[in-house]
């Protein structure tokens, strides 16, 4: 898994506004108003490490891209979401944006080492170099330790964004080095599909009895990455509903 950046494409091809803005759609949802306000305050002096927890996989990545645009948009009220920098970031083509993508698998130590060779360079533009470790809980132990070594050295102009379901799923030493911003939790009232409902029922039975789950999931191809994310999201929705009732209202 290589570090994803496309400098040539960023220079030679500018995506349409509609293509790029689609990447910001989840971040622009009214549910994330509080999150955008918090990130706006941090932008003047951004932390080197920012953990984005809560929300869904898509929401976390969208907010990370929005924050990258906020840090690099040259307009008076950033992010404008229509200048070349914002459009390139929305399409993941920006020259100072690097994505280590753990959404479909683990982030390997080789990828982090490749990144470290880049970090010694100054940003190519006037803003910040932004490194997004998408689903940072996918960092292997060796990769996480290699990242920690990079964080030991002050790197002006570089911001690491670590989207993850919960901060507890990251190494404590990583969490201790950064700020944490919590996205709005997934809405609890979205109905499940019949297929997902079967998995929800099976998981509930397993929690109650300790039986059946491993038989259901151990078959080859029984659970792919997309299904696993939907199951986790369903659990998060249920958790949000319980917490909302406990606190007498919505979160």
Identify the function of each model-found stretch.
Residues 1-70, 85-88, 156-251:
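Charged, glycine-rich active-site and insertion segments that engage polyanionic ligands
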Residues 37-42, 109-130, 136-138, 142-150:
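Conserved alpha-helical scaffold flanking the Walker A/P-loop in AAA+ ATPase domains
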Residues 45-46, 92-94, 124-127, 154-157:
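Short loop/turn elements that form and flank the Walker-type P-loop nucleotide-binding site
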Residues 62, 78-81:
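Cys/His-enriched microdomains
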Residues 68-79:
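Post-Walker A helix-loop "phosphate-sensing" segment adjacent to the P-loop in P-loop NTPases
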Residues 81-97, 101-108:
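AAA+/P-loop NTPase substrate/partner-engagement loops
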Residues 94, 112, 144, 167, ...:
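ATP/adenylate-binding site constellation spanning eukaryotic-like Ser/Thr protein kinases
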């Amino acid at each position: 898994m290589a570090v994803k950046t496309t400098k040539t494409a960023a220079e030679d091809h500018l995506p349409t506004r509609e293509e790029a803005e689609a990447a910001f759609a989840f971040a622009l949802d009214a549910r994330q108003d509080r999150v955008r306000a918090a990130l706006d305050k941090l932008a003047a002096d951004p932390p080197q490490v920012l953990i984005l927890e809560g929300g869904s996989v898509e929401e976390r990545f969208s907010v990370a891209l929005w924050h990258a645009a906020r840090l690099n948009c040259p307009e008076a009220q950033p992010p404008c979401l229509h200048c070349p920098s914002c459009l390139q970031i929305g399409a993941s083509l920006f020259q100072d944006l690097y994505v280590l993508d753990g959404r479909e698998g683990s982030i390997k130590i080789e990828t982090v080492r490749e990144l470290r060779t880049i970090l010694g360079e100054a940003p190519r533009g006037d803003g910040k170099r932004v490194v997004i470790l998408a689903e940072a809980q996918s960092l292997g132990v060796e990769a996480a330790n290699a990242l920690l070594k990079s964080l030991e050295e002050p790197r002006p102009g570089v911001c690491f964004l670590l989207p993850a379901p919960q901060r507890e799923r990251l190494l404590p030493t990583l969490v201790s080095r950064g700020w944490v911003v919590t996205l709005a939790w997934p809405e609890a009232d979205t109905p499940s599909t019949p297929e997902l409902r079967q998995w929800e029922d099976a998981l509930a039975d397993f929690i109650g009895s300790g039986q059946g789950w491993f038989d259901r999931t151990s078959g080859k191809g029984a659970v792919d990455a997309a299904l696993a994310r939907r199951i986790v999201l369903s659990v998060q929705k249920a958790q949000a509903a319980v917490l909302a009732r406990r606190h007498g209202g919505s979160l």
